[in-house]
Amino acid sequence: MDQNSVPEKAQNEADTNNADRFFRSHSSPPHHRPGHSRALHHYELHHHGVPHQRGESHHPPEFQDFHDQALSSHVHQSHHHSEARNHGRAHGPTGFGLAPSQGAVPSHRSYGEDYHDELQRDGRRHHDGSQYGGFHQQSDSHYHRGSHHGRPQYLGENLSHYSSGVPHHGEASHHGGSYLPHGPNPYSESFHHSEASHLSGLQHDESQHHQVPHRGWPHHHQVHHHGRSRHHEAHQHGKSPHHGETISPHSSVGSYQRGISDYHSEYHQGDHHPSEYHHGDHPHHTQHHYHQTHRHRDYHQHQDHHGAYHSSYLHGDYVQSTSQLSIPHTSRSLIHDAPGPAASRTGVFPYHVAHPRGSAHSMTRSSSTIRSRVTQMSKKVHTQDISTKHSEDWGKEEGQFQKRKTGRLQRTRKKGHSTNLFQWLWEKLTFLIQGFREMIRNLTQSLAFETFIFFVVCLNTVMLVAQTFAEVEIRGEWYFMALDSIFFCIYVVEALLKIIALGLSYFFDFWNNLDFFIMAMAVLDFLLMQTHSFAIYHQSLFRILKVFKSLRALRAIRVLRRLSFLTSVQEVTGTLGQSLPSIAAILILMFTCLFLFSAVLRALFRKSDPKRFQNIFTTIFTLFTLLTLDDWSLIYMDSRAQGAWYIIPILVIYIIIQYFIFLNLVITVLVDSFQTALFKGLEKAKQERAARIQEKLLEDSLTELRAAEPKEVASEGTMLKRLIEKKFGTMTEKQQELLFHYLQLVASVEQEQQKFRSQAAVIDEIVDTTFEAGEEDFRN
């Protein structure tokens, strides 16, 4: 073991120098403390046999031979061990879309307890060994659990592994040892909680670099990966992916089982300088924060790394699925052109002593990290562009909507303004019309207008009477025609004024209907005279004109209408109106009796007196004339001459029923109605007279009080006292009180007397009714 270790150390140093020269231009000067050679890798991606894209090695021949010899003895066991014990779960294949020979990147979960114990024993055995030849099949499983516990790795080591086409499911874990040279190692790599996210892009936002000094443990950088998304896309910082990495717009970023946002890894490589790179947005479970996983401070002191590493996996299962990414360049171009894979990996923890095998895997991870970062960045750039377009379109639509809304509001305001203007005009016009109608109503109801119309009606009546004389009509024909036209115009104006003032209620009055009919007849007469002035000698037209002229006699009735303001006339007309139902009933009885007697007389005396009893109508007319008691003796004598002497008892019965009963009933109803109306009128007049007298007395007393002391406002009692003093002179207070009490008693006595009188009147009526009923009973 010791003999083999010497050449192996030399070989490793040579490989380290080669790798240093190979990546010198892409890394920033590290800040490293010797002796702190353990890096914590909480959820590291395990490259299960990912071959190189072109199937060739990038290592020197010596390193390639050495790696092939070391791998040949354990490749089968390593493959088998990683297949059987890779976290106790199947690794989900993940394609990066590079080449068909690309392997699968598994998703990691927490270890089982039994597997943890076995790996802990294996880790102790490998941790104590310092030879490179200590590589055996259990070391592969260390790589699955956390492939670089306490060691840096040489970049470019495992390229020969990928070129050989052997599916390497893990590499040996080298914990300390003679192959870890002391000093700054710019190509050591440390992995975060989830190496599966693989540094989705390079961000150049230098403001996000937090300068965290190395305090004893170079890899304890207090890197807090917060659960919220702090994704800073590359285009937001004004920079793009390096060295021709093509971003596929159709690539998709890996999604989490719990949908947690990407966290932003903040780090610092010693001093703050522009060449530092962020590790992008690492998709990570929010419970796997470095705040919660700082337990690695306690078990990175050259102790059992595997047992302590198991505790960091207890935070929860991490299931990851990666997305397809198409990048046209080979892994060689990604390694040589991308300036940040090694430097970006070294930015998480301090640089440690180099290890030749870890660098190759780290380079492959760096390339996959760049691809994943480019995929995520391209998708987010594309998503942001789409969202920007959508926001612009939405802004345009919003602007158009606001314009349409503004136009609608303006139109609505215009309509509302026009509506308000129309409403205001309508209200104004209605107010003017109402005022005009009120003025016309006051005019038509005024005494002057009534007097003028009454004078016109009287003059028209006198003119109609004068036209009955032939000599006056012939001499004053022209004057009569002129006056008739003037009267006609006055009647038309009166009707129009009343229709305007009263509206349709004008036709609800009988007198108004009579006036309107007379006015209509006058209009027809005037029109016929004007249109047929040359056909005046036509017989039919002449008769029509005579009819209209005779109807002008109805204007005399207007005199009675103008006399309606007289109280007596109003009482008579009111009484007739109230007695009409009773009169109508009596008239129906009279007509029934007349019809019965007509039928009997026609059947009996049709042959004896055919002139009077020929048919039912002539018989009714004959009986109606008998109501006047005219010529009833002639009817009897003619019938007796023809042998119908028995007509006399029938005529007597008819005259008694019709004349003495029914006609007297009509007169009785009218008289009773008139008496009732007169009594009510008298009572009403008496009450009105008493009310007027009382109001007059009260007004006189108030006038005297106001005239005496106009400025003094006295109460009701004071006013009464003053009134008493004026009537009875000066009195003492005791006398005033006694007088006031006396007046109250007198008033109460008068009230009681009034009640007594009313009760006595009721008793008198009852007694009278009783005596009348007794007399009727006695007579019966």
Curated annotation (Swiss-Prot):
One of its GO terms (molecular function) is calcium-activated cation channel activity. Residues 1-447, 501-508, 564-581, 672-780 are cytoplasmic. The CatSper calcium channel is indirectly activated by extracellular progesterone and prostaglandins following the sequence: progesterone > PGF1-alpha = PGE1 > PGA1 > PGE2 >> PGD2. The CatSper calcium channel is directly inhibited by endocannabinoid 2-arachidonoylglycerol (2AG). Indirect activation by progesterone takes place via the following mechanism: progesterone binds and activates the acylglycerol lipase ABHD2, which in turn mediates hydrolysis of 2AG inhibitor, relieving inhibition of the CatSper channel. The chain crosses the membrane at residues 448-469, 479-500, 509-531, 541-563, 582-604, 646-671. It is found in: Cell projection, Cilium, Flagellum membrane. Disulfide bonds: none annotated. Residues 470-478, 532-540, 605-615, 629-645 are extracellular. InterPro entries: CatSper1, Ion_trans_dom, Volt_channel_dom_sf. Residues 616-628 dip into the membrane without crossing it. Residues 211-241, 285-299, 402-412 have a biased composition (Basic residues). Its main location: membrane. GO terms for biological process: calcium ion transport; cell differentiation; flagellated sperm motility; regulation of cilium beat frequency involved in ciliary motility; spermatogenesis. Testis-specific. It is a multi-pass membrane protein. Residues 1-37, 71-306, 376-412 are annotated as: Disordered. It holds the Pfam family Ion_trans. Belongs to the cation channel sperm-associated (TC 1.A.1.19) family. It is linked to Spermatogenic failure 7: An infertility disorder characterized by non-motile sperm or sperm motility below the normal threshold, low sperm count, increased abnormally structured spermatozoa, and reduced semen volume. Pore-forming subunit of the CatSper complex, a sperm-specific voltage-gated calcium channel that plays a central role in calcium-dependent physiological responses essential for successful fertilization, such as sperm hyperactivation, acrosome reaction and chemotaxis towards the oocyte. This is Cation channel sperm-associated protein 1. It comes from Homo sapiens. The gene is CATSPER1.
